[in-house]
Design a protein with these regions (language model features):
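N-terminal Rossmann-like NAD(P)+-binding domain of SDR-like oxidoreductases, especially those catalyzing
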Residues: 1-185
Length: 185
């Protein structure tokens, strides 16, 4: 199945990160009339100046809109979905880092679990507010979900029932929430 991306509005979370900024740039430079709505909280876990330099380059594209905000803020996420009505959502935002999850677990619950829940809810309710559903949600998980599996390379069929970090547990939880939402809604 090939997605038609021309003339679509695509929401990319984590747009100031390496993958998010590269994806946004690729879409803006190769797809006709695509509009990218990029969200990032610009937290300082990674170098903020590096994130800002990526955004400077993306702002050169007239079809790029950047919104600074926290996905754990339900009203912020609701406003984004209401105002921009994206047809596609690429969720790359997350509080990253296995070791940091030992020091600041609240950040992982807030960003990774609550934030992703708000994205799922935004997708679910868009049809009511905009008259069209989100056509596709792409979620970026992490190889951390494979924990102590010794078999390489990893496979999607490998067991991932025993995460070894809170970060991995939040990423696996998000996979499960996305699966449940896809079946329920």
């Amino acid at each position: 199945m090939r997605l038609k991306l021309e003339q679509k509005t695509i929401l990319i979370t984590g747009v100031a990160g390496f993958i998010g900024s590269c994806l946004a740039k690729q879409l803006l430079s190769t797809i006709s009339a695509v509009k990218i709505i990029g969200i990032d909280n610009l937290n300082d876990y990674y170098d903020v100046k590096l994130k800002e330099s990526r955004l400077v380059k993306l702002r050169l594209y007239p079809n790029f809109v950047f919104l600074k905000g926290d996905l754990a803020d339900k009203s912020f996420v609701e406003k984004v979905f209401t105002q921009y009505s994206p047809q596609l959502v690429v969720h790359l935002a997350a509080q990253a880092g296995v070791r940091y999850s030992l020091v600041n677990p609240d950040a992982y619950i807030s960003s990774n679990l609550v934030g992703f829940f708000h994205i799922l809810e935004g997708c679910r309710h868009l049809k009511e507010t905009a008259g069209h559903p989100v056509e596709h949600l792409v979620y970026a998980s992490s190889s951390s979900v494979y924990g102590n599996n010794r078999k390489l390379p990893y496979s999607v069929g490998d067991p991932v029932d025993h995460p070894v970090s809170l970060y991995a547990a939040t990423k696996k939880s998000n996979e499960l929430m996305a699966h449940a939402y896809s079946k329920l809604y």
